[in-house]
């Protein structure tokens, strides 16, 4: 069940990213591709969530363990994979890979795409996966904190790049 919680978190991230990217572009083909990918990621989330519910009791995976798995997976999203992918796709091949620089460049572009409703949906999906009320008071507080964090980090990265 723990791996299914982690998969729900991955699908939360990818669906919110493609929804944000699709809404940010004016290019109709890219907009449609992103819409379809985001919808597909939501279907994956539902599949993993439904299976996770089946295994929770058998695996003895309570709230705290689910929360730990989810937070661990969120932390892993800051790992080398996205930074290196950004470097490979955007940097001059002669330029050596610098994880910190590539991670910041990727985050600067990605965070700028997000709007509050993307954060609201991501928090609701996260809360649902760990067993919290997706529309409760704690969720609303988390949305405010997460949205502030996205805006703050986006602004800081943009200023640093200027």
Please state what every model-predicted region is.
Residues 1-162:
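Non-heme di-metal
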């Amino acid at each position: 069940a723990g791996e299914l919680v982690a998969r729900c978190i991955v699908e939360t991230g990818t669906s919110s990213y493609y929804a944000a990217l699709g809404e940010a572009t004016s290019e109709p083909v890219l907009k449609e591709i992103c819409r379809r990918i985001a919808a597909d990621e939501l279907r994956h989330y539902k599949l993993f969530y439904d299976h996770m519910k089946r295994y929770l009791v058998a695996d003895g995976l309570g709230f705290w363990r689910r929360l730990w798995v989810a937070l661990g997976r969120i932390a892993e999203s800051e790992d080398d994979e996205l930074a290196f992918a950004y470097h490979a796709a955007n940097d001059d091949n002669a330029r050596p890979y610098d994880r910190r620089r590539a991670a910041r460049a990727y985050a600067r572009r990605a965070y700028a795409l997000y709007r509050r409703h993307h954060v609201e949906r991501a928090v609701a999906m996260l809360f649902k996966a760990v067993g919290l009320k997706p529309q409760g008071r704690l969720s609303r507080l988390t949305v405010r904190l997460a949205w502030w964090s996205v805006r703050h980090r986006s602004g800081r990265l943009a200023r640093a790049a200027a």
